Design a protein with these regions (language model features):
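A short loop-to-beta-strand structural motif that recurs across blades of beta-propeller domains
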Residues: 1-2, 47-50, 96-99, 146-149
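Beta-propeller blade termini
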Residues: 3, 23-30, 72-79, 101, ...
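Glycine-aliphatic tripeptides that mark coil-to-beta-strand junctions in extracellular
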Residues: 34-36, 83-85, 133-135
């Protein structure tokens, strides 16, 4: 952690335990106290780790929680509009994005809501990509050289993936 001085420079550094082999970190207020907490993806644990802001330049690590196989990138937004921030994770070997809904007390719903995407989802971004006023998720898919966009319409109550007739 590098503490900002407000002039483009940073003061000191502090290390906090954040899972095992963490790949990404996202800032999110998981317990609704007005202070930014952190969530890391722990690739080797197949889990996420929440670090709660103690409001004194320290963080307490909560227990790890499942997210899918080989979580790569994490993004945060209020996907449901309930005032609590939620998280989405790209799970590279499952070819899925998992969405866990924030409860506002430092925990998330389990099991997550899984969404199939093209091969090996990696980087992610959130925003209103289709102009409907709702937050969507974009993810890059490494092996297909494409970007998938999961719209809010299908994010919380996903439609089943259709099976082509030749696969029945």
């Amino acid at each position: 952690m590098l503490w900002g001085k407000g002039d483009g420079k940073f003061d000191g550094s502090k290390v906090f335990k954040g899972g095992k082999q963490p790949l990404t970190v996202v800032n999110i207020d998981v317990n609704n106290d007005g202070y930014l907490d952190l969530v890391t993806s722990s690739n080797s644990l197949h889990a996420l780790t929440t670090l709660i802001n103690n409001k004194d330049k320290t963080f307490s690590s909560l227990r790890d929680f499942a997210s899918g196989n080989f979580p790569k990138f994490v993004v945060a937004a209020d996907f449901t509009g309930d005032g609590f921030e939620d998280i989405a994770v790209s799970n590279a070997t499952d070819d899925q994005i998992s969405v866990s809904l924030g409860k506002g007390d430092g925990t998330f719903t389990y099991p997550p809501i899984y969404h199939h995407v093209n091969e090996h989802p990696q980087g992610m971004a959130v925003g209103d990509f289709n102009g409907d006023g709702l937050i969507d998720i974009a993810t890059s898919c490494r092996d297909k050289n494409m970007v998938n966009i999961l719209t809010k319409k299908n994010m919380i109550n996903p439609k089943p993936n259709p099976i082509p007739p030749d696969k029945i």
